[in-house]
Amino acid sequence: MLGLGQSAQAYASDDALNMNQAKDKTYSVPGCGRASDLKYPHRDGHSSSHEQRSGILPTECPGPTLNTGAGSIGIPGCGKVTNRVVSDYNKNARSTLANFDSSKMTEARMNSKNVPIGCQDTSDPHFNGPIDQHVPGAGSPQSQPHHIDAWNSVSSRRADNNNQDMMDPQTASSDRYNEKMMREENSGVSASSYTTKVQGYPASIPSFNQETEEKETYAYGVGDRHNVPRNQIMDETNPSANVLNATDHSISHPENKVLHK
């Protein structure tokens, strides 16, 4: 069964254990393992959160259980899954979870507060970790298919590791500008081109030195002291004022900063 703090993905990957457990189980629902020694909280309008019901998949829950092959114990809950048969190093065929059709799945999150009335909580009731992880299947008889990203763990602090489009730090909000910038300039042609990747925090963004065609070295970054638009230079007589860069008219993107020379 799904253990304390164990993700459904880790549960599904242990095919050998699941197959051994399946030998001692009986099945009253097609494609679903049933066992009197497995208990989970079931909520409806007539029961409390402390009441328990035996089994893996309630009979009133539509749809197949997620399982790792014929005759194996399914992951608690219901959902759609495509099984794929692969061969290991000993050329023994085994079934493994392959492609999830997330548009036809309902989910429960590992947080009992998010389970609505009448739904099957597939998570351990004592799990109070910082991660709300999608577990395929909520077991809700009234559930409607909707899209989720299977196995996408999202922190409760809303931090993620997705790459984002580069934004001007002057216009980006502090919670969204969670980026680390790496910029490469090819300035040997009339128009400059950049390759940008963002990830991290502004405070950790280093400056990168780039030698131009005139052998002048510029440093680019966010943490430097002076912010000067790329098509301007700092007035030597008045450091607080900027003047147009007469040597480089081709660069017209003010979000690309020349910070010091």
Swiss-Prot record:
Keywords: Mitochondrion. It is found in: Mitochondrion. Residues 157-175 have a biased composition (Polar residues). It comes from the Eukaryota. The keyword Mitochondrion applies. GO terms for cellular component: mitochondrion. Residues 22-63, 121-148, 157-176, 242-261 are annotated as: Disordered. Its main location: mitochondrion. The keyword Transferase does not apply. Residues 36-53, 250-261 have a biased composition (Basic and acidic residues). This is Uncharacterized protein YNL195C. It comes from Saccharomyces cerevisiae (strain ATCC 204508 / S288c).
